[in-house]
């Protein structure tokens, strides 16, 4: 369809880490009957707050993007929030009411725990449906998308803007002032410091692209922001379990 083509041309992918093309996810095989589009707003990864900040600052963009996806899929929309972000529920519900989408989508609070945001957990928590081993959410009639992805779809349709920038969290005990930044995709992390964030002197012993549970350890800051980079975490020695190396024999 033209809508899926627009998403494809905008280069929109899953922004929660997997970077799976959004136009493919929104066009499942004909034998998959999609009943729900589930926006994974749990953000259970420690240190990361980029989705929370996005929902707080631009709730209208999330609701608009979800409405577009629902029109494409013909499904019902659910936004899943962890209950430590319960203050956002009335904010999003007000926007849903304002836009006239109360029959099309709702906001559900789920328990704050890790790994609440994983696909099978979030589907089970929201819908009471178990996804069998080896199966995908689409097999259970569900499409799961990330907050950033849904907002990027809104930008593509309303502004004609491709996915050329993203927001990410800079956090961890080694960061002087943890923050969320919006930067062009491809920006080197080393180019962001010290102008946009600074580290406590000689305190960062571990640099992670992403969060501490699902992220990847990096040797230094000479790597770029990708479409799936949700944050950069700088950990101190107290926050990591590092043991002294010794001879293995």
What residue ranges belong to the model's regions?
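Iron-sulfur-cluster electron-transfer modules
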Residues: 1-102, 108-123
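Ubiquitin-like/PB1-type beta-grasp interaction modules and other compact soluble beta-rich domains
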Residues: 199-232
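Hydrophobic alpha-helical positions that pack around
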Residues: 76-189, 195-200, 211
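Ferredoxin-like iron-sulfur electron-transfer modules
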Residues: 232-249
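Helix-rich terminal scaffold detector
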Residues: 74, 152, 246-249
